[in-house]
From Swiss-Prot:
Main location: nucleus
Keywords on record: Coiled coil, Nucleus, Ribonucleoprotein, Ribosome biogenesis, rRNA processing
Keyword Coiled coil: yes
The keyword rRNA processing belongs to this UniProt entry's keyword annotation: yes
Matches recorded under PANTHER family: RIBOSOMAL RNA PROCESSING PROTEIN 36 HOMOLOG (PTHR21738:SF0)
Protein name: rRNA biogenesis protein rrp36
Single Gene Ontology BP annotation: maturation of SSU-rRNA from tricistronic rRNA transcript (SSU-rRNA, 5.8S rRNA, LSU-rRNA)
Coiled-coil ranges from the UniProt annotation: 146-204
Similarity-based family: Belongs to the RRP36 family.
């Protein structure tokens, strides 16, 4: 029986032969084999029942709720992806920031306030030509003169003391600017005339002569005196100069020591 079952049954197909089996060993009985098959069939039936119940439950759920659930899942997945990307990005940024902090020289030094400069008057835009500036912005002097006249007329009529004081201050600043502008024009004119004369002398064969700063100031002062000759402005100017010199001399004079009586008082 054994040999026929081994040759014709499943054991022969599985590669089990008579020599490999001992006489004392017994094969699985038919009852046990049927029990195994019954257990497998029961497991399959349970899994089928579970899948059927799940399908029936899904069929009972409305379609809108399923769509909303699917959208929520997709949103959560996208959020997780974005969070991971942000984490990587922040790590990179932090590393770059640390590298910049380490490599910045003079980190704790106090920098002076940077003043904004109009690009037209910046040194990077080229050399300044004063002649072109005068031609292009000459109307500002005319506007300043008219403004001074308007303020003077307003000061005559004004009765408010605070307003009158503010007008006087603005007039003072405008007049000082006008005087400074006239002095600069005078200095440029005088030096231009002197250079033209020196060029003519060099052409005649003479050596060039260069004025020092003190000599330039004296030359400009002489031209100013010549323009004021025969007027009261010259006397006023000389008187003002005399007062300034007197005040400077007073500062340098030695002071008298206080007496003992004044100290006791």
């Amino acid at each position: 029986m054994k040999s026929s079952s081994l040759e014709n049954g499943t054991l022969a197909n599985a590669g089990v032969y008579e020599d490999d089996l001992d006489s004392d060993e017994e094969l699985v009985s038919e009852e046990e084999f049927e029990n195994f098959n019954n257990e497998d069939s029961e497991d399959d039936e349970d899994s089928n029942n579970e899948s059927k119940t799940a399908k029936s439950q899904l069929a009972e759920i409305p379609f809108d709720t399923l769509l909303n659930a699917q959208r929520d899942l997709l949103k959560e997945q996208q959020k997780t992806k974005i969070d991971r990307k942000n984490m990587k990005h922040t790590e990179k940024v932090d590393k770059k920031f640390l590298a910049k902090e380490r490599n910045t020289p003079l980190k704790n030094c106090q920098v002076k306030n940077q003043f904004l400069v109009f690009a037209k008057f910046d040194s990077l835009s080229g050399n300044l030509s004063k002649d072109k500036v005068k031609k292009n912005y000459g109307f500002l002097n005319e506007y300043r003169v008219s403004e001074i006249q308007q303020l003077r007329d307003e000061l005559k009529i004004c009765k408010d003391q605070e307003r009158a004081e503010s007008i006087r201050q603005t007039l003072k600043s405008l007049l000082s600017k006008m005087e400074r502008h006239l002095e600069e024009e005078r200095a440029e004119r005088v030096m231009h005339e002197f250079r033209a004369q020196e060029k003519e002398r060099v052409k005649e064969g003479k050596k060039p002569f260069y004025l020092k700063r003190n000599e330039q100031k004296k030359l400009i002062q002489m031209d100013k005196y010549k323009s004021m000759e025969g007027t009261k402005a010259l006397d006023k100017y000389i008187e003002k100069k005399r007062r300034r010199r007197a005040q400077k001399e007073k500062k340098h004079l030695p002071r008298a020591r206080p007496s003992a009586n004044s100290q006791n008082k």
